[in-house]
């Protein structure tokens, strides 16, 4: 194995031996390759082992045909949501969270390491954030939580349901630019009995007018962004906070790319391209955004995400 501090942009940077090992895994064969028509199977393997250069992706016939194939809803609900809706859409994340529905090749996405890391990251947030809210609550009668790019906000809904002692003093503002996410979130919050605590607003996370937030959850938002843009986004979120507030943000690590390059390859085809970072880079993003380190945690199974806790200084 090689250092995770080496700069790796995408699956092409993973050594050929590692890619050959990955494409030959039992899971890839059972839940992906064996289900593909012969032509698609051959294209899939060839495009993974002998990829087009980055500047040729848009015109590479294999990539184009594979994208058209995976865009079919009866083939994959996950890939369909990414391709036909938008990359990083809440619809794809909801499917990964719930491991449903199961179309032709979706079992692969739900069982692969990178796919399983998404609900595992959600569970890690649900497990680690309540004590932060309690800590803030020691000094404040009400805690104002902001979730930019919230999607349905499954994380905060579960946190409030699982921790009734903090529910009565927690007010949450969920911001998303997808109306479908807003509608789903409101429905889920109402069903869970926490709709009085959670307000959903359709808006742009970069154009908010808040200055008094106590806690921000920015989960999954900077994963596709270059470091310089990630800093800009986290800085903007910091501006919505009071001094001493806590910001929790996550970033996908290069470990995901190294250990599951096949899934990262499929994500590239679908247009959901992540910017895989090192732990050092994630820490630097926090520092340059005006945050003092106050801890971190990860998705426990595979540790594919670094989740930083920073204090606004």
Predicted regions span which residues?
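Class I SAM-dependent methyltransferase core
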Residues: 147
């Amino acid at each position: 194995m090689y250092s995770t501090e080496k700069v790796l942009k995408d699956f092409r940077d993973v050594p050929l031996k590692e890619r050959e090992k990955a494409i030959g895994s039992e899971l890839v064969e059972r839940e992906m390759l064996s289900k593909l028509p012969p032509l698609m199977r051959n294209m899939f393997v060839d495009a993974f082992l002998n990829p087009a250069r980055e500047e040729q992706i848009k015109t590479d016939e294999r990539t184009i045909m594979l994208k058209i194939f995976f865009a079919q809803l009866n083939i994959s609900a996950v890939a369909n949501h990414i391709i036909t809706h938008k990359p990083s859409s809440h619809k794809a994340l909801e499917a990964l969270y719930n491991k449903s529905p199961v179309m032709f090749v979706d079992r692969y996405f739900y069982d692969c390491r990178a796919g399983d890391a998404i609900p595992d990251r959600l569970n890690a947030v649900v497990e680690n954030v309540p004590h932060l809210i309690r800590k803030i609550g020691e000094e404040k009668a009400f805690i104002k939580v902001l979730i930019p790019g919230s999607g349905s906000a499954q994380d905060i809904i579960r946190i409030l349901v699982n921790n009734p002692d903090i529910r009565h003093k927690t007010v949450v503002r969920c911001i998303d630019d997808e109306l479908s996410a807003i509608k789903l979130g409101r429905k889920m919050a109402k069903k869970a009995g926490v709709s009085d605590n959670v307000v959903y607003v359709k808006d742009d996370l970069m154009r908010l007018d808040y200055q008094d937030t106590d806690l921000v959850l920015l989960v999954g938002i900077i994963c596709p962004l270059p470091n310089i843009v990630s800093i800009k986004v986290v800085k903007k979120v910091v501006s919505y906070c009071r001094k001493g507030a806590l910001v929790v943000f996550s970033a996908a690590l290069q470990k995901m790319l190294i250990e599951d390059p096949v899934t990262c390859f499929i994500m590239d085809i679908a247009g959901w391209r992540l910017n895989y970072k090192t732990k050092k880079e994630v820490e630097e993003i926090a520092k340059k955004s005006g945050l003092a380190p106050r801890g971190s945690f990860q998705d426990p199974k595979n540790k594919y995400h670094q989740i930083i806790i920073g204090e606004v200084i």
